[in-house]
Swiss-Prot record:
Role: Phytoglobin that reduces nitrite to nitric oxide (NO) under anoxic conditions (e.g. during flooding or in waterlogged soil). May not function as an oxygen storage or transport protein. Has an unusually high affinity for O(2) through an hexacoordinate heme iron because of a very low dissociation constant.
Family annotation (Gene3D superfamilies): Globins (1.10.490.10)
Protein's UniProt name: Anaerobic nitrite reductase GLB1
Location of the motif Homodimerization: 45-49, 115-127
Gene it is expressed from: HB
Reactions mediated catalytically: Fe(III)-heme b-[protein] + nitric oxide + H2O = Fe(II)-heme b-[protein] + nitrite + 2 H(+)
Tissue note: In vegetative but not in embryonic organs.
Cofactor field: heme b
Binding note for cofactor: Binds 1 heme group per subunit.
Length: 165
């Protein structure tokens, strides 16, 4: 399944990709809090230094899996990412509110988030989704659909990662 391109060169999220994302999100949505935490624990397993980017984790003695602030943040990020993916084709673009994108861009810039951080997060997201779905639901096409949706969300955040003029 190839990604279609619009006349302006933008990548179009196709019907098949949308169907895969919607089907898998329907399975995962009811367990979003747990999956969000697993997603972040994977990020920290791959890149332990990423914990230092979160003020609420820096001086905390609470184990990550029990940290209420991490649980809340992780669920929020996971749900926003998945909902943005689910709306991508219908809206034709990332549907996170512009004010939210600006805030995300500014926050990611302030904490020095770089391409490598987005790559680790993308890998952790795909692994979390793969583990959350029944084995017969996960496929290369499913992986590509989620990877494309994540890529478009990251591109939207990066567009807002600019220093104040």
């Amino acid at each position: 399944m190839a990604l279609a391109e619009a006349d302006d060169g933008a990548v179009v999220f196709g019907e098949e990709q949308e169907a895969l994302v919607l089907k898998s999100w329907a399975v995962m949505k009811k367990d979003a809090a747990n999956l969000g935490l697993r997603f972040f624990l994977k990020v920290f397993e791959i890149a332990p230094s990423a914990k230092q980017m979160f003020s609420f984790l820096r001086d905390s003695d609470v184990p990550l899996e029990k940290n209420p602030k991490l649980k809340t943040h992780a669920m929020s990020v996971f749900v926003m990412t998945c909902e943005a993916a689910a709306q991508l084709r219908k809206a034709g673009k990332v549907t996170v509110r512009e004010t939210t994108l600006k805030r995300l861009g500014a926050t990611h810039l302030r904490y020095g988030v770089a391409d490598g951080h987005f790559e680790v997060t993308g890998f952790a997201l795909l692994e979390t989704i793969k583990e959350a779905l029944p084995a017969d639901m996960w496929s290369l096409e499913m992986k590509k659909a989620w990877a494309e949706a994540y890529s478009q969300l990251v591109a939207a955040i990066k567009r807002e990662m600019k220093p104040d003029a």
